[in-house]
Curated annotation (Swiss-Prot):
Catalyzes the conversion of glucosamine-6-phosphate to glucosamine-1-phosphate. It comes from the Bacteria. Its EC number is 5.4.2.10. Belongs to the phosphohexose mutase family. Activated by phosphorylation. Mg(2+) binds at residues 100, 240, 242, 244. This is Phosphoglucosamine mutase. It is an enzyme of class 5 (isomerase). It comes from Anoxybacillus flavithermus (strain DSM 21510 / WK1). The gene is glmM. PROSITE patterns: PGM_PMM (PS00710). HAMAP family: GlmM_B (MF_01554_B).
């Protein structure tokens, strides 16, 4: 990753790291890179509910107008909503202002190309080079050649109309509990499920600019689990701040994670003959129980590095149509170009309706292996992982597991940590395996 762009756009503390000055430049230079071949290019901008969203939007808009772009403001909308509308409205680029599941003080900016996909590494590097250049030599249109800004707040409704076409059934007779994380889906989700005749109970849908992700949403599903039981709902659906993730809760208040949701959708699509190449794409963090459950259904799997962008890359490259992460980013490439919480929620409830099975039964077919993750602070993460003694103890543990468990040792992408993860039939074995490896890393490379 570059100096500004991480795995999911530019992120930082709003007004401290991600300043309006930087946002102006990102709008100007990013807009130029994405639209330089087009006269009067059209660029869409959406944002989540953070207090800093207005400030950054104003700066971004100014940067885009300064290179002659026509800007359409979508207002508060989910990240996948921006991705869909960028392509559907024939825009040259889309921009989302959000820091997803991060706390309120953070914010971020991510771009989509005209095809609705996130930018390539090459495009990001081109924008970074302009951000780092000492002089701004880009064109400065004047008079009638300057860009203009218009509001298109109906964009959210256009996106919801599209989503409704992805399911055949209405949801009458199903009681759905929603947790919108006080974020981008706060207005969208209730409308969507009510339009499909579900009985809807909603929490986490009163954004005030400061409460996004605060004890609610897909990173705090325990709040929704209690709400489901209180309301007697059939299913709970928790989104994150920008609406690109879904974590579900069954009728008993049990959490159903991204692996389980992927398994349920993969099995259903496969039975319908709609799972391309009978394959699902996941990351190395997916649970061993996920792979074993897929195998039992005759479904193949492909693994990528952690990050939904790598899942999407693999799907595009080899023509797969279902992939995702344990964290709840699920990608249905037949319908959208990025992880989409609302879309995933629709597919999941549709499967419940068609199969007439409760979520506990659908999710129960996948037996999750106990998982233990330990972070070890180190002086040199790459050296720690490559170390011969560390590799020897990893091999030793893997031999003992004999295929009935899994070890994953990887560096953190952002911190001086090595993450040691084990999956095994019991919690005790998980603890033993992780500690044996972590102890060797600590002894030799502990910070």
């Amino acid at each position: 990753m570059g100096k500004y762009f991480g795995t999911d756009g530019v992120r930082g503390i709003a007004n401290s790291e991600l300043t309006p000055e930087l946002a102006f430049k990102i709008g100007r230079f990013g807009g130029y890179v994405l639209t330089k071949d087009k006269e009067r290019p059209k660029v869409l901008i959406g944002r989540d509910t953070r207090i800093s969203g207005h400030m950054l939007e104003g700066a971004l808009v100014a940067g885009l107008l300064s290179i002659g772009a026509e800007v359409m403001r979508l207002g508060v909308i989910s990240t996948p909503g921006v991705a869909y509308l960028t392509k559907a409205l024939g825009a040259q680029a889309g921009v989302m202002i959000s820091a997803s599941h991060n706390p309120v003080q953070d914010n971020g900016i991510k771009f989509f190309g005209p095809d609705g996909f996130k930018l390539s590494d090459e495009q990001e590097l081109e924008i970074e080079a302009l951000l780092d250049s000492e002089q701004d030599t880009l064109p400065r249109p004047i008079g009638k050649d300057l860009g203009q800004v218009n509001d298109y707040f109906e964009g959210g409704q256009k996106y919801l109309q599209y989503l409704k076409q992805t399911v055949d059934e209405d949801f009458s007779g199903i009681h759905v509990a929603l947790d919108c994380a006080h974020g981008a889906t706060s207005a969208l989700a209730t409308h969507l499920f009510a339009d499909l005749d579900a009985d809807v109970s909603t929490m986490g849908a009163s954004p005030n600019g400061l409460n996004i992700n605060d004890g609610v949403g897909s990173t705090h599903p325990e709040a929704l689990a209690a709400f489901v039981k209180e309301k007697g709902a059939d299913v709970g659906l928790a989104f994150d701040g920008d609406g690109d993730r879904l974590i579900a809760v069954d009728e008993n208040g049990q959490i159903v994670d991204g692996d389980q949701i992927m398994y349920i959708c993969a099995k259903y699509l496969n039975e319908q003959g709609r799972l391309k190449h009978q394959t699902v794409v996941s990351t190395v963090m997916s649970n061993l129980g996920f792979y074993k459950a897929l195998e039992a259904q005759g479904i193949k799997s492909v693994q990528t590095a952690v990050g939904d962008r790598y899942v999407v890359e693999e799907m595009k490259k080899n023509g797969y149509n279902l992939g995702g992460e344990q964290s709840g980013h699920i990608i249905f490439l037949d319908y959208n170009t990025t992880g989409d919480g609302l879309l995933t929620a629709l597919q999941l409830v549709n499967i419940m309706k068609v199969t007439k099975k409760p979520l506990s039964e659908l999710a129960g077919e996948m037996k999750k292996y106990p998982q233990k993750l330990v972070n070890v602070k180190v002086t040199d993460k790459q050296e720690a992982i490559a170390n011969e003694e560390v590799q020897r103890v990893i091999r030793e543990v893997e031999e003992e597991m004999a295929g009935n468990g899994r070890i994953l040792v990887r560096p953190s992408g952002t911190e001086p940590l090595v993450r040691v993860m084990a999956e095994a039939p019991t919690n005790e074995l998980c603890d033993q395996y992780v500690e044996r490896i972590a102890a060797v890393i600590r002894e030799r490379f502990g910070a």
